[in-house]
Amino acid sequence: AQEEEAEQNLSELSGPWRTVYIGSTNPEKIQENGPFRTYFRELVFDDEKGTVDFYFSVKRDGKWKNVHVKATKQDDGTYVADYEGQNVFKIVSLSRTHLVAHNINVDKHGQTTELTELFVKLNVEDEDLEKFWKLTEDKGIDKKNVVNFLENEDHPHPE
């Protein structure tokens, strides 16, 4: 069922998305000022081109920076993107209201970090949370290495 969900017309899911949770095998990557402590604003899916554009904010050296990353779909259904190294991004579960994803990042030092991510369009459903926590557990990420972005006080303000 998960693969069928991911095969739907993704372009219609383009629009505002927000970060709820991100888990990481390398906690430094999601700590304050970390490169993957990302606050998503928008996702733009292009089925024809096989791309997804990520628009998010990240805090670097105490200042908010708006970032745009384009990922390209591969034959195996994953997406690859350059951001803080090489990334292979897989959509694990997707609906009109949630996106649960797994990202493998290899940074410029050759360090591999696995990240689990939950993004939502509206309110977080219990079922969406269950999918995220199951993936996080399956990937061996400890709950203490997960950041809740909705409850975090320090976040970018809309422009």
Curated annotation (Swiss-Prot):
Q: Name one GO cellular component term.
A: extracellular space
Show the Pfam families listed in the entry.
Answer: Lipocalin
Say yes or no: keyword Phosphoprotein present. Answer: no
Write down the PROSITE patterns for this protein, in alphabetical order: LIPOCALIN (PS00213)
- Please state where this protein is localized: Secreted
InterPro entries, alphabetized? Calycin, Lipocalin, Lipocalin_CS, Lipocln_cytosolic_FA-bd_dom, OBP-like
**Tell me, which GO biological process terms does this entry list?**
sensory perception of smell
- Which UniProt keywords are present, listed alphabetically? Olfaction, Secreted, Sensory transduction, Transport
Among the GO molecular function terms of this UniProt record, one is: small molecule binding
Give the transmembrane ranges: none
The similarity annotation says:
Belongs to the calycin superfamily. Lipocalin family.
Function comment: This protein binds a wide variety of chemical odorants.
- Describe its assembly: Homodimer.
Protein name per its UniProtKB record: Odorant-binding protein
In its UniProt entry, the species of origin is given as: Bos taurus
State the taxonomy lineage.
Eukaryota, Metazoa, Chordata, Craniata, Vertebrata
